[in-house]
Regions:
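Signal for well-folded cores of large energy- and translation-related assemblies
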Residues: 10, 49, 75, 90-93, ...
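Structure-specific DNA junction-binding interface
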Residues: 1-76
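Mobile acidic interaction elements
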Residues: 62, 99, 110-111
Length: 160
């Protein structure tokens, strides 16, 4: 519904930014690394995820598309809600992706609110899905490039 928000930071709270967007100010819950780098008066452009509950509308914001997609995957795991996913992302998106791919239960259980069973469930459910999310530090490869690279390698193997 709300794919993103751009505006000026009007307040930095303990777990959220207040972003001025036209005549509105919107509270956006964000991972701690994003909050640490935000300053009142600075411009932000956030990728967002809106969560609707019976008694609450919550907006979660991320600096890049990869962290947003990781957040969406994390909340798909039973036992991990939006606030828990933000706690996990506070460890850094790249570190979380690496932990899921390498099945590092110890890393995940070191995060507040994540027990051994939830960590194991997250690894089982997400280890294959996580490969489709490019880390924020590396650009996503275009599928055609991968197919082209494979074709070139095959031709070189045949002596062409």
């Amino acid at each position: 519904m709300l794919a993103g928000i751009s505006g000026q930071v009007t307040a930095v709270e303990a777990n959220a930014l207040v972003v001025g967007c036209g005549p509105f100010r919107v509270r956006v819950a964000c991972p701690l690394p994003l909050l640490a780098n935000a300053a009142v008066g600075g411009a932000v452009d956030l990728h967002t995820s809106l969560h609707v509950r019976e008694d609450d509308l919550s907006l979660y914001g991320f600096a890049d598309e990869a962290d947003l997609r990781l957040f969406q995957l994390l909340i798909s795991v039973s036992g991990i809600g939006p606030k828990g996913a933000l706690e996990i992302l506070a460890a850094g998106g790249d570190a979380v992706r690496q932990a899921l791919q390498s099945e590092d239960v110890a890393f995940l259980t070191s995060i507040k609110g994540i027990g051994k069973r939830t960590a194991e469930r997250a690894i089982i459910e997400l280890r294959e899905k996580i490969e489709h999310i490019a880390p924020a530090s590396a650009p996503a490869r275009h599928p055609r490039s991968s197919a082209r690279d494979e074709a070139v390698a095959a031709l070189e193997g045949l002596g062409w």
